[in-house]
Amino acid sequence: MPSFDTVCEANLVDVRNAVENTAKEIATRFDFKGTAASITIQEREITLIGDADFQLTQIEDVLRNKLTKRSVDVRFLDIGEVRKIGGDKVKQLLKVRSGIESELARKIQKLLKDSKLKVQGAIQEDKVRVTGAKRDDLQAAMALIRKEVTDVPLSFDNFRD
C-alpha cells in the first residue's frame, strides 16, 4: 500500500552554516564594530546578543537573509522574547522547530478524513504517515495538505509505492 510521511524538519547543516555566515558578517560590518553583537548556535537553539533591541533586529534580519539564501524556511524559527542581561546588553533565543506538534497532527488527520479521499492519516510521534490505495490519492492528499496548512513549513518524505 503506497504511503508517505508528512514532517516538519529543518536541515540543521544549512541552519548552522547560515548562523556561521551571519557571525562572520557581524564581525566585519562597520555598524557592529566595538559592540557586543554576537550569534551562536547550540543544537536547536540560536542565541542573539547585542547592546540594544535594534541590534538584535539587525542580526535577526541578517540571519533571515542567510537562511533564505540556503533555502531554509524562516518559519522554522520560534522567536523568543528579548531579555536584559548584565552590562546593558540584551539577549534573544530563537529555537529551530522540529517535528509536528500533536495539535497540528490531529488537524492534518481530521483534514484528510473530511476530504473524502481514500487515504488514512496515522500520527507517529512527530510525523503523520498517510497511506492510501492509489498513488493519485496520495498526490491529491499532498496538494490538500500544502493548500490548507500554511503556517508551518511541511515537507513530504519516505514515499513508498
From Swiss-Prot:
NCBIfam families: PRK05412.1
Species, as recorded: Verminephrobacter eiseniae (strain EF01-2)
InterPro entries: DUF520, UPF0234-like_C, UPF0234_N, YajQ-like_sf
Similarity field: Belongs to the YajQ family.
Described function: Nucleotide-binding protein.
One Pfam family, short name: DUF520
GO cellular component, one term: cytosol
Gene Ontology terms for molecular function: nucleotide binding
Protein's name in the database: Nucleotide-binding protein Veis_3464
UniProt keyword terms in alphabetical order: Nucleotide-binding
